[in-house]
């Protein structure tokens, strides 16, 4: 049994000491760090490899870097953050850790020495920690109970609070602070108070390793700690695939009949259980490996560390300036050696990085971790106002929020509701059964599955599906065809595990600030792929989806849809017209889809057998929210298409297929209107010689759209719906305001649609400025890889730029390629700087030489290459709207560059 180690230390400013703390924590195998007096501004963070960071800042008017505490917890420990106290008097951060003694709360506390803290304040803080806790830090309180030579007023107040609460003291009994000023006396103000921990299990010692006027204290508690169990994969590199296939074939019997829903569910359980049993037998157990730290102290470093400890003790006891000088020299020499150790380790790691198989794709693993959004677990606020105290409460709080979200609005009238329900009661027309699923289809679909996908609750991932033997695939075909024949979807595949991802910039305590990510069964999504192919064929044959819908359709992309908008705007510029636009935001569109309304449209548009299958697929779907290893109580999804599924986007497109199109009722000339939809992103443009006439046409359409949304229980968010006007007029047009649900829409000078910023004059200057800013931010993240002194190979550096930086500005190059050279030249400057950082070349080396040696294209060459390929794709496009985007060499009034000139046409 490894004891749980806790560090208590006043850092006296941690910014320049973080690397020393990291090395100390890993070499001493410390599990929890209670660090006080960080002296960080609000928002500043400290990264210690292998530890999660939970701070509490001291409030100040000017956001000064004073006070503050933080708890660092090893990421492998199962823990949950608790309340935070941030006042001028006290800063406290708490984390609850699962141990062999039960849930134990660890808190870091810092009490400001210049303020008065009474006994009741200490009592309230200690009592709020629960029955089992350890609170350690810098109390700035002196008393003989914890080994000080005198009693201060705050010490007497704290001693009284400890007597009232029954908390015990854990201290060294000797001074923990040795001030730098010789006239000040040493004091014992760093210690811990605890409750619910047996006295014989906790010990405390002091160390002389870290540099501060406070000594670090190490507490050891003889108890086990509970570690986070990562979701185990059934088939790993330690699995004997041949043994797995043989074992699974022996467990599956094809002599079965599936003629009812109960039999289908039993077959699904049998298949899932057999896969688990076969994987358990054929996979070798692998011991859990904790977080490894690559830097190892050399013999020289250990000797210098011992020497520094000895000189520090002597300098503190003697208070001799010469002894202090020797101590500072030894500390400086040790810092230089440790800096060299870290530098050598870093250089070796960079030199070994590559994107090849032999290097284990170490380069891509490293860059992927940089792009991934950092996870910081924060307790959210429940509906009652209190904060969640553990993972189960957090999961159920999220589930309560999502259960409300997965409920359709109440907009339609009683007559409209009844009309939809009556349509569901009408008899179905005779139709041929759904085409059976062949084994060859399943095999081809499995081959195309991506490996890096998380499994659902059944833990059957895509790698497991790729290892299935022939007998298992035959059994799977029996289940799939039984679902089509019986028109029953098994309940096991209707359960979703939902992870909540924080939206950057949103308040962390609010459930609305998190985005749900659903994890569904891979067996279910494989069936959905096969059914989606059949549905797509029917939709193409019957032309169910409108041409203006480009979302989730084969051969359609965001670039073509934005191209339609820009071409319409440029035509309005040529015709000396205003182009008024409305960019519509649908509120929670996918999560609020009305099931009865969707099923009624499926019944009307598709053959009869699909009605029963999709009705069973949508009914009684459930979900559970997962927070680390804890799940919420199962909840019901009463509305919405399954998020994370294959059929979800397709069903949403079917649900919105009858979206109203602009016509003569709305506008004087509907030919000058353009409707563009990409899933739930809707844009409507209308050009006219009079900006107010264009506004009236848009207003009439929005009135019709609002009535359609009310009929099908969808909601438009007027706060996020905008009404820009595109024009080349030097004076800003005074357009008539447009209302939606009684709210006047904002009229900004630019709009962002599908990742492309469209400004008023369509110069793409704001878009290129924002894109360049994002590229510089990404290069700053990758600076440790792409700097001039990096030991990584030139080939690997080039690969990092090409695959991690260049795609940011290459997106939409077919559209913004018509911009003036002065606008996109900033991208070229960015690339030039990146090339010089990669190669570390002298200033006199020309940019053309760098482009040639690194085999990189200039921005102008990239524009020509991508637009040429784009033009070829448009010529072969099966959508008539996409083919119309091809330049027709029109007579242009303006001398500005258009799409035809970008493609090299006159």
From Swiss-Prot:
<dbReference type="InterPro" id="IPR036691">
    <property type="entry name" value="Endo/exonu/phosph_ase_sf"/>
</dbReference>
<dbReference type="InterPro" id="IPR005135">
    <property type="entry name" value="Endo/exonuclease/phosphatase"/>
</dbReference>
<protein>
    <recommendedName>
        <fullName>Probable RNA-directed DNA polymerase from transposon BS</fullName>
        <ecNumber>2.7.7.49</ecNumber>
    </recommendedName>
</protein>
<keyword id="KW-0808">Transferase</keyword>
<dbReference type="Pfam" id="PF03372">
    <property type="entry name" value="Exo_endo_phos"/>
</dbReference>
<dbReference type="InterPro" id="IPR052560">
    <property type="entry name" value="RdDP_mobile_element"/>
</dbReference>
<dbReference type="GO" id="GO:0006313">
    <property type="term" value="P:DNA transposition"/>
</dbReference>
<keyword id="KW-0548">Nucleotidyltransferase</keyword>
<dbReference type="InterPro" id="IPR043502">
    <property type="entry name" value="DNA/RNA_pol_sf"/>
</dbReference>
<dbReference type="GO" id="GO:0003964">
    <property type="term" value="F:RNA-directed DNA polymerase activity"/>
</dbReference>
<keyword id="KW-0814">Transposable element</keyword>
<keyword id="KW-0695">RNA-directed DNA polymerase</keyword>
<dbReference type="Pfam" id="PF00078">
    <property type="entry name" value="RVT_1"/>
</dbReference>
<feature type="domain" description="Reverse transcriptase">
    <location>
        <begin position="482"/>
        <end position="758"/>
    </location>
</feature>
<dbReference type="InterPro" id="IPR000477">
    <property type="entry name" value="RT_dom"/>
</dbReference>
